[in-house]
């Protein structure tokens, strides 16, 4: 059986932490920011963990 390939789109969007959690960037922070409030853009800053329902699916895309 050939080697399993990592899903290249998922590898660009998700990272695995040292403890095994999967993290992602928050949406709505790329462009058209001038009409979004500073409070909203601060809230969208940084990374967050992937929802528990999605972790199994994302791990399979990342060959885990």
Swiss-Prot record:
Comp. bias (Basic residues): 1-42
GO MF, any single term: structural constituent of ribosome
Source organism, top-level taxon: Bacteria
An example Gene Ontology biological process: translation
Annotated Pfam families: Ribosomal_L35p
GO annotation, cellular component aspect: cytosolic large ribosomal subunit
Membrane-spanning residues: none
HAMAP family tied to this protein: Ribosomal_bL35
Keywords: Ribonucleoprotein, Ribosomal protein
Protein name, per record: Large ribosomal subunit protein bL35
Family to which the UniProt record says this protein belongs: Belongs to the bacterial ribosomal protein bL35 family.
Disordered: region residues: 1-64
């Amino acid at each position: 059986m050939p080697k399993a390939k990592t899903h290249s789109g998922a590898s660009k969007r998700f990272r695995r932490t040292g403890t095994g959690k999967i993290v992602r960037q928050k949406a709505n922070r790329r462009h058209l920011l001038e009409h979004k409030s500073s409070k909203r853009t601060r809230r969208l800053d940084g990374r967050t963990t992937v929802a528990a329902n999605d972790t199994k699916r994302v791990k399979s895309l990342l060959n885990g």
